[in-house]
């Protein structure tokens, strides 16, 4: 659906060049929720604005739905943008318009007949759970409700692609979860491709199928969420499990710290007790959790193994064969 090839964006300010994006290559499959994860200043917002050409790249190609959009004429670009919806951190609603009027606005601009506009807006308000708020004004809504209006407005023209620019970062955790659940429902029901930028790990865990990590304007890693967190040494896995570091310091001097990762049915298997019985090692569980990530049940354990070195190595080979993806964490 989206293909970025050698995307580079350089800003010139006070006689200096600031490289916001450097040789970014990215593939977003059709029908996925694809996350761009990075801290402030990583280039996330610049990247998403290059996708719809609100920012024109300095170099590289931007392919959306089979078209290289940097080569389109102004008229062709306007038509292409109608197939891309966008939602924002600060909602960007018209205070003087009702909820109905905000959602109807892009359809009015596009010249839709009034009867068709009413039908479409009512359909979308039902989809986002605001059918009873059609006559309300933005100042009468909560933050989560405002974002739902923004989502409905972005969906109004029937886009193939939805761009989300930190759409949940201004919301509290409970509201964030409900908005992300709505995006997942829209993705499944409409088959809509969603490109979502965020600095929040929980957003990636809850809703993304795939992710790219952006650091200092460069993609340092990309792939399926489950694939990356199951890969020892991956950057995403490291970021997901930074919380294990405090527990990792509570270790026996002769112990070996191992991070284990389980997906699906394997998360319910008693692999640790089986490993202890078979390989004459002791296991001290320092930390553990079971979560829903990318639609799958995911378990992780930080375990301290003690015993003879050869027995521990045999145990680790066994765990790898069982799909537990063991990663030894160095001491110190």
Swiss-Prot record:
Record field: catalytic activity:
L-methionine(out) + ATP + H2O = L-methionine(in) + ADP + phosphate + H(+); D-methionine(out) + ATP + H2O = D-methionine(in) + ADP + phosphate + H(+)
Source gene?
Answer: metN
Q: What is its EC number?
A: 7.4.2.11
Q: Which organism is it from?
A: Symbiobacterium thermophilum (strain DSM 24528 / JCM 14929 / IAM 14863 / T)
Gene Ontology molecular function terms on file: ABC-type D-methionine transporter activity; ATP binding; ATP hydrolysis activity
Instruction: Write out the residues that bind ATP.
Output: 38-45
Main location per UniProt? membrane
Read off the SUPFAM superfamilies from this record. Answer: ACT-like, P-loop containing nucleoside triphosphate hydrolases
Sorted UniProt keywords: Amino-acid transport, ATP-binding, Cell membrane, Membrane, Nucleotide-binding, Translocase, Transport
| PANTHER family documented for this protein | AMINO ACID IMPORT ATP-BINDING PROTEIN, METHIONINE IMPORT ATP-BINDING PROTEIN METN
Q: Which residues form the ABC transporter domain?
A: 2-241
Membrane-topology annotation of the record: Peripheral membrane protein
The UniProt entry, under Pfam families, shows: ABC_tran (PF00005), NIL (PF09383)
Which InterPro entries does the UniProt entry name for this protein? AAA+_ATPase (IPR003593), ABC_transporter-like_ATP-bd (IPR003439), ABC_transporter-like_CS (IPR017871), ACT-like_dom_sf (IPR045865), MetN_ABC (IPR041701), MetN_ABC_transporter-like (IPR050086), NIL_domain (IPR018449), P-loop_NTPase (IPR027417)
Name assigned to this protein: Methionine import ATP-binding protein MetN
Q: At the top level of its lineage, which domain of life is listed?
A: Bacteria
